[in-house]
Amino acid sequence: MDIIDAFATKNKCYQAAIPLYPQGIMLHSIGTPQPSAAVLARYFDQYQPGGQSVCVHAFVQADGTVYQTLPWETIAWHCGGAANDTHIGVEMTEPSAGMSYAEPAEQITGTYRTAVALFAQLCEMYSLDPLADGVIIGHAEGHRRGVASNHADPELLWNTYGMGFTMDGFRQDVYAEMHKNDEEDDEDMIRYNMIEEVPSWAREEARRLIDRGALQGGTDGRLDLSEDMLRTMIVCQRMIDEAKET
């Protein structure tokens, strides 16, 4: 994902510079056949785009590019309701020829993935739980909650093209994106399942911990002891032994 600074400095919203303390993120789709986030960013870089006081924090497109138009901690006028004061607003671009676009699935899927990556980064940045109630919502969900105007996005876009995407699925995908490195680290972590597998430098102390019942395996007899856990236990044991000697 590539985030490009494209701040809409001419926009009334940017100039107002009202502080935002992000409590969530709202997902939108632009509602017009325009796949270029750069084009949209330029359009919103005017005092009142289309004669309206509107702006979002960012536009995302299918190739992984994000055009950021407002600082994340500035209120955006993106949903016509109270969520403006609590949520970052992000717009997805849409297929260039609307209903007759030759490859809408590729465009929409790419934009969806870019949005997932951005939302995951923002959730990490602001310590937000993507699965918590009301943290990540679509514009339509915001309306049902009474915090946004009456719009049907982004589900309208997904449903129109039969993509099968849902906001529940989006939240799950953001969560998975945030934790994918955890899974990779866990897979790479060295584990010891038998005392014979424990390195010689720690084996004797590990035996003592097992004999004392401080280190126990599962019901199948496997220790399932990670290298990090082993080092921590050995260091603690040695500190205890040194304290006893003094």
Sequence positions of predicted segments:
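Sec-exported extracytoplasmic/periplasmic mature domains
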Residues: 71, 120-127, 175-179, 210-214, ...
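Short coil-to-beta-strand
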Residues: 81-93
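Short, solvent-exposed alpha-helical surface patches in non-cytosolic proteins
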Residues: 184-246
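Extracytoplasmic/secreted proteins, especially bacterial periplasmic and envelope-associated proteins
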Residues: 54-55, 110-121, 169, 197-204, ...
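Basic/polar, cationic surfaces and motifs that engage anionic cell-wall
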Residues: 2-8, 15-19, 95-188
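N-terminal catalytic cores of peptidoglycan-degrading enzymes
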Residues: 1-84
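Solvent-exposed, acidic/flexible segments
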Residues: 20, 83, 104-112, 195-202, ...
